[in-house]
């Protein structure tokens, strides 16, 4: 993609490759007056600023707290916005200084070169699709803010969860800068997993009511079971752990180094334990994204199939270990709920664990003989296609079960699962009610509001102004969010904004999935994003965790651009 500006900013500047394939060493100037040393120096400065910001966001952001859970939303938001605003300020200052130097020393040739590449960006690439979609998302959010009856609240998000236009703008700008100008470094993966493991371990100790941070002393006893670690509400906590789980699973599955494989496996085990002990139903969706999506990457090789079987066996082993701990320390643990409780109560669980480890061990020992006897088991395109058929069949069965339980009124057939299959106002802690009423409110919007919504993060204002009494009477609750990120965006930034956001997620994940560089952190970012995206169908975007999603998308796309062929360095 020789005309792409986003590729231009991602290549090693010790070599400069022009569109004709000619290479200039860093000690020479091109015919157009470009200086490789100047470009390398500029690139180093920009990458230094971005790397420091990533270091703070990957390590400090997940762990920072102030006054227990009482102000955790404000604390995370303030840290994130200060970090990004500081990064933008330094980047702007650098840009001005470099532009002045370029003007004085090189007659502005580098600046003109940069802007010429931006104007001639290749519009046929998946990179451009993601960039265009996120731009539509931002423009729609800006128009939504201007058209909102609560313009100030829509901009700052101070009447909601601080997810107004200001925060959305920080997401988009940081995405553009990191994905376009940051040269990927493998340490970002290690930092993310290290801080993530700490968050998970703290959450695990909270499950055993150790309260090592002392946060539970400052909240009501009735709230102890639903606030944990350095994240807060268990729904938000398991959303974050899902990011760690998806990232570590992909890294473990693709790693060749024995020591790093052990490290990623330990992170995976910790994340499995943490997400199960988090006792939130959105964990099932994160796991569905992980175990449903990994085979499309791993089933191409025998090694990948073996790693997938190992991951599956590990999950059931962790569940079994938690069950044993629950029986050994019944007075210490909070206890499992919902589907995980059904699984641990399954009497044959130990045999399930042994079965999966037996399958994994057997496959590891015998897989080399499958190529002739059973080619579909040795990995490859056919194996992936078989999995795709099984996935389609599984989704079909699930759809039938929903139809059978709701339309055919055969819910009794499904025993403990009927609480998940029967969709009513009470489904998902009254999510059924707020989803239904949210869509009804959207249908009542005038055309302009259907397109651009009520204003970013103004759902609470909308709900209190229209359905407050009905909401309290029906559920006994006051909802300030739709408990579904996509429905939330549909009402607050309209069809245009929510479509732009969804298209951005799909385009970015498609780009990462098609990457052929072999960089495992790109696939780690892909599965972290996929786990988050699926669980957000029962959750909302908050500045406690959502910044990490945008970081995953940013570094994943940066990796894709850096590894793309025929790159042109412009910084």
PLM regions: where:
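Alpha-helical transmembrane segments of multi-pass inner-membrane proteins
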Residues: 25-29, 33-67, 85-100, 135-151, ...
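Transmembrane alpha-helix boundary signature
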Residues: 96-123, 144-156
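Short, charged juxtamembrane terminal tails flanking transmembrane helices
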Residues: 565-571
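Short, hydrophobic transmembrane alpha-helix segments
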Residues: 65-79
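Non-cytosolic membrane-interface motifs at loop->transmembrane helix junctions
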Residues: 76-77, 155-164
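TM-adjacent membrane-interface loops and short helices in multi-pass inner/ER membrane proteins
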Residues: 233, 425, 429-479, 493-497
